[in-house]
């Protein structure tokens, strides 16, 4: 069994130093929170993925995937009545899926309860259809 740590807990360090610390304290892998890469997670791109790959290689740890996928984003929600908001969330998750794959990760932890909770008054069945 491998153990991984979300890099959010070390976001006060540079990405490279954080990954090195994760390895130093005995973890074999890292889950990356997108908001630790850019202030606006919607702006993450392939160069950010490349930086993560290099930092993980240097530290000798594996990128297991992404975590807190929709945290610190605005205008994204999985079950909101606004179709544009749902579509934007879908496109963002597709982008993160590609970046996870590029980094060699296999796990995506949604977390981010505000973007997946039901809007007040929305029946579960309606929210399920929207998602």
Describe the predicted segments one by one:
Residues 1-13:
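Boundary/entry segment of secreted carbohydrate-active catalytic domains
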Residues 9-11, 34-36, 69-72, 114-116:
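Active-site-proximal loop/turn and secondary-structure-junction residues that shape catalytic pockets
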Residues 16-17, 57-58, 62, 75-131:
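Active-site acidic/histidine proton-transfer and metal-coordination neighborhood
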Residues 16-35, 103-104:
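Catalytic domains of carbohydrate-active enzymes, especially glycoside hydrolases
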Residues 19-22, 46-54, 93-97:
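Generic structural signal for well-ordered alpha-helices
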Residues 31, 65-67, 109:
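Conserved beta-strand positions in the central sheet of alpha/beta enzyme cores
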Residues 33-57, 112-119:
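Glycine-rich, proline-tolerant flexible connector loops at the mouths of alpha/beta enzymes
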């Amino acid at each position: 069994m491998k153990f991984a740590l979300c890099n959010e807990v070390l976001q006060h360090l540079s990405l490279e130093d954080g990954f090195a610390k994760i390895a130093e304290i005995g973890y074999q892998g890292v889950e990356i929170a997108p908001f630790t890469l850019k202030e606006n997670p919607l702006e993450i791109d392939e160069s950010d993925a490349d930086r993560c790959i290099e930092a993980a290689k240097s530290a000798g740890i594996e990128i297991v995937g992404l975590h807190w996928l929709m945290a610190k984003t605005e205008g994204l929600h999985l079950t909101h009545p606004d179709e544009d908001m749902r579509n934007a969330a879908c496109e963002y998750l597709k982008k993160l899926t590609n970046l996870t794959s590029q980094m060699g990760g296999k796990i995506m932890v949604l977390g981010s309860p505000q973007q997946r909770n039901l809007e007040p008054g929305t029946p579960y069945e309606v929210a399920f259809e929207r998602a």
